Amino acid sequence: MRLQPGSRVPFKRTGIAVAVVVGCLIVAGRITGVVVDWLWFSSIGYAGVFWTTVSAKALLFAAVFAASSSVIAASGFLAHRYARRPGSWQVETARLSGTPEFISELADQLAPRIPWRTSIAGSAIVLGLLIAAGQISNWDLVLRFLHQVPYGERDPVFGQDIGFYLFSLPAYLAFKNWLLQLLSCSAIVAAVVYGVRGDITFERPPCRLSAAAAAHGSALLGVFFVLKAGSYALDRFLLLYDDNGVVVGAGYTDIHVELPVLWVLIGLAGAAAVASWINMRRRDYRVPAASLVLVFGTSFVFALIYPALFQRLYVKPSELQLETPYIQHNIALTRMAYGLNQIAVKPFPAEQELNLTSLEANRATIDNIRLWDVQPLMDTYAQLQEIRTYYKFLSVDIDRYRLEAGYRQVMLSARELEPSMLPANAQTWVNLHLLFTHGNGVVMSPVTEKSTEGLPSFYLQDIPPVAHGGPAIREPRLYFGEGGEGYVIVKGSVAEFDYPKGKDNVYTKYSGSDGIAIGSTARRSLFAWQFDDPNILLTDYVTSTSRILLHRNIQDRVRTIAPFLTLDRDPYLVISNGRLFWMQDAYTTSRWFPYAQPGFGDDANYIRNAVKVVIDAYNGTVYFYVSDPNDPIIRTYQRIFPSLFKSLAAMPADLQQHIRYPEDLFQIQAQLYRAYHMDAAEVFYNREDLWQFPRELIGIDGGGGSSPGTPMTPYYMIMRLPDEPREEFVLILPMVPSQRDNMIAWLAARCDPPNYGKLIVYAFPKDKLVYGPFQIEARIQQNTEISQQISLWNQMGSRVIRGHLLVVPIENSILYVSPLYLRAESGQLPELKRVIAAYGDRVVMEETLGGALAALFKESAPLASPPQGTADARAREALAHYNRAIERLKAGDWSGFGAELDALRPLLEALGGGRSEGQK
């Protein structure tokens, strides 16, 4: 049955009503999202950050929308004004021109029925909205451009301050792209108007245009050539990121061929623009055709083909000679971009002079050699300390504390709540959002100690936390952590689960400062809409004092406040003054540093650890401390968000003792430094001294007998650097030559104030062979006693897990230590069973670190042969003290070990003096 004309009206009205409702829902969703964000930013004290961001987005959207819509509408209205009047285009004329008759009839009937002004205005508005929506993400780019600060160094080609490349050039490129979008949309709207009105006909060939359409097209083509000239001008600066030569950055061909060609193209594009505008009167199709061929033909021949031929035929045969200055630019600016130019290089003799006396003098280092790897320790924590299935240790952090036992490196992990681990029938809305709201407590272990069963010792354990020489914790609850997905509601009528106690549970009420008040019906409705969760509105457990906690995952929390910062992958827990805090390293990065080698992320080539973020695990307060005030990017953001950042000096003194050099940054710098320690262009070109990361054997059975090994990763340790007066917390990584396994250097990053952030490379003598980690691994595998013991364990149903091999610099020598774990084939509880130590040509394996060191240095102990009978008693006494020292060392009794060495020293000196007298 055919619909009557009148029956279409209700259908049309229904369609309009549905469209209006859908539009209102979309707008309402956007508005509620903005309101919720405003409430959250206000609740944490960063309303100023919110308004700066929102106003920047709104102003940019409005400006782009207004400009885009106006220009597109102007183009459309000009076409409407000068195009043929509807009905004036006769079908017969169209037929003679070769246009299909049905198209001619359709256009002739359609044109008079179109409300042209309304259609053009509507199209301009829609296109303007789409363009503005696409450009709104550039709000950060615009603010950085407007508030930029100079870098203080200039590029070697154009002499521009590097701040121009970090802030201005990306903005200019974004502006150019917007103008091209705008021009394209303007041309499309005008073409549609002219096409429907009959000003464009499609003959075979070519396309025939009316005088108005030809003039309009010439004008737009002239604008296109102006934009193309501007694009070529910007392309000059993009040569500094070219990656077609020996290194990243402009090379000999770029400077001597491509740069002059770009100047020629700028001139040609400008001339083509003028010719196009002159052609608005002549309207000769040959002018735009010739302009396009001239500009793009020249670009193809002289910007693509000619440079490639020049590079191959002229530059390649004399590449080193011609490219040397540009290689030097790349080396200098890459080192600057990654902070490699701040690395100090010091010699390391790599001597073989360690003995028990040396170990006692470096007792702080020995006491803090890490025997527990992260994964075995996390597995052990899970078995011993998770207490209930809904608790989870998500990571293990490494830090240092001044405890009763001294300056100790520790490993610690937060016991976080994982509601998803609750039984399926217990995952109710009340449990997930009102009852199970927080984790509880921390476990902390010394890195070197173990029990007789091979399990870790604990400084902190259990719920509530019990300290055994560890720091006291007054507030162990974690409402914010590395988990913390989803919202929770606190201060309601139902008490929150705190921790299990025997057969009963202990409950608590949140008394912190975080949260958005949701006591009113309006607020509850707002959040019910935002989270699509009507329970927030319907529940009786929400009271007038209730608050909702959002963004409880610490990285999500930081990113929401400061999305322009790049976050380190490993936030770590800090215990300070009885409270728990998260420390998050944050970076400023860029991909616009000229001549710098991309080294991470999306081709980023600049990085600074500019910010240390501290998050209170209970209150959720977030503080941003500027750790690199010389970084121009963070200085720019300080101008944009003056209330967001604090100086590092404002960080509480106790928290300052726990800042550490971030491992992600160190890894990036070490990766680049493998090549960029070579500062001579010829050496760099030939890759004569390329380094690489050492290999090691880790995991079950060391990865197998034929394993090629795993690249070593940086590790923290407490040690006394050469020529330094005291021990400190450092991050180190050994280096070996490319395709070789002997060690050539080790890189250290200092973590303790006031030397925080200083990088040092300790280089070994070129004429001395120092065993590298993989060579030590080979010697361990070749040790008959060790290999037989491992085979025996495997035959008994246990799995042997090789731990990381640690290179431990002590004084001017290198000691190697590696833990060995056993795990039942069907179990998940690794036990630290043996410690392997190597020094010089010796490799030993014992049950404890003390035992391994005692066995390793037993034969190299400084024993003296008495020259006379009167010295026999001294020699026997010295030997007795030495044997007791060894026993104390095996037992881990360092105080007894030190006392025996103190008693041994004068006896050895007396024996040495007696020998000297006898030899005279």
Where are these regions (language model features)?
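Soluble extracytoplasmic regions of secretory-pathway and membrane proteins
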Residues: 3-4, 17-20, 24-43, 47-891, ...
